[in-house]
Each structure stands twice: as C-alpha cells, then as structure tokens.
C-alpha cells in the first residue's frame, strides 16, 4: 500500500492524493459474481428526487459480496484481492474446497494464498467468521450481523471495526467506532479482524470532476439560493437571520433524527460523535 501525492502539473492535479495497492488484481472481476447496477440519479419510482447530490458518474458493475458467510466447515483459499467501485473496502475472491467461489470483504492483512473458514469450529484468526458467542471478549470484529442469519450490517467500510466488550446471557455488548455501546444477540455472526484499506481516508480527490466521476453532484448552500428554493435564500448579505433549517423547513444542524423506539432498549450508551 502506497500513498502517492501527484505533482502540481495542473490545478486539477495539485492537491490529488492517491492510495495505490500493487496487490490488487488488474484484470476484470469474476463474471459469475457480477450483476448490472443501474443508476437512479437519486430518484424514486415516481421520478422525484429523494436523495440530493446524486447523478452521472462512471458506469459500474455490482460485485455480489457474501455478507452472510454461512458456508460452514468448508475451508477456502484467497485467490486474489480486487478493487470494488461500490464500496470503500477492497474485496477478496475466495475459492472453497468444493469448487465454489465467493467475494468477501478483505480484512486487514489478508493476502492471496491465505486460508479462511466459517462456522463454530473456525480458528480465532483474521478473516474467519463465527457466532459471537464463540469469539473471545475484547476481540475486534467487522461485518457484524444485527439479526442472526440476516448478513453483516455493522463495520463494513474501509478501516472500520467493532469491539466485543462483554457477554451477558444470550447477548453480547459491542463498542462501535462512533462510541455507541449496543447489545446484539450472541448467535449473530461476525468476522474477526478489521476491514482493510484503512488508508482510504487519506485520499484527496483534488478537483470537482473527480467527485463527478463518482456520481456525486455539487452541494449548494441554502444562503446562496433564492427564497423560492430554500428557507435561507434571498436577502441582502449572507446572514439569513433564523435557526438553520433543511430545504423543507425542518430543524437541522444537531437536531436528533432517530425515532426507532423499538430498538432503543438495545443501546447501552449513545454515540459520542
């Protein structure tokens, strides 16, 4: 893994910082595990914008990643590591002993030729997936399930991890990167280790066009708009003279938005960031 700072040969190159990994596969992805990925442009089935700042960008194919890791008792060998345009983490193509191939999230330190396994009898080493009742307290894990059998939902981005801090009956307590402490059923599965490609956070796109290649459109400030477009719009000068609100008039900048009371009982401590 190398951090490359581009020479300032043009204004668009001046601030670019790239993360280069020579171990990544340079060819095409494994075709049977690739699907078409249509772009929504941030629109729903009615054609209305439901998510702003999305549109355009390079065409991408979706790699089918195994988040469930439910092929128990069959060892697999890592064939290669690959880039995935749909996520910040890299993925690994693994070959199981019965001949099946699957993509998994590539943990930190995983390389071609390594052996991994899933199931209650799997060894305690990075890349192996076990129910959390079989993982020692204090371990760092990623790709953590929130419901048994649903597939990993927590800690899937590059460089992220969750720590198991306690085990109490049929639940384990997890410490998330945000500082939140949360209870999850101990039958839920998790993969040992942390997600690789932690250097992803060091990259700098360097110019607006690089964001457009990724399908990210500009974010315009409300104060720069007209009154018809935003509650902050219009007026003389830059002061909008009211509490900050969203384009639809709802309070923003710090207002709590969580409303799922059904799962509040599983949160031991609120997040700190």
Swiss-Prot record:
Any GO CC annotation of this UniProt entry: large ribosomal subunit
Pfam families: Ribosomal_L2, Ribosomal_L2_C
Superkingdom classification of source: Bacteria
GO MF term (any one): rRNA binding
Record region (Disordered): 28-53, 221-273
Keywords for this protein: Ribonucleoprotein, Ribosomal protein, RNA-binding, rRNA-binding
Single GO BP term: cytoplasmic translation
Annotated Low complexity bias: 39-48
Subunit structure as annotated in this protein's UniProt entry: Part of the 50S ribosomal subunit. Forms a bridge to the 30S subunit in the 70S ribosome.
Functional description taken from the UniProt entry: One of the primary rRNA binding proteins. Required for association of the 30S and 50S subunits to form the 70S ribosome, for tRNA binding and peptide bond formation. It has been suggested to have peptidyltransferase activity; this is somewhat controversial. Makes several contacts with the 16S rRNA in the 70S ribosome.
Recorded family membership: Belongs to the universal ribosomal protein uL2 family.
Name of the featured protein: Large ribosomal subunit protein uL2
Native species: Pectobacterium atrosepticum (strain SCRI 1043 / ATCC BAA-672)
Gene designation per UniProt: rplB
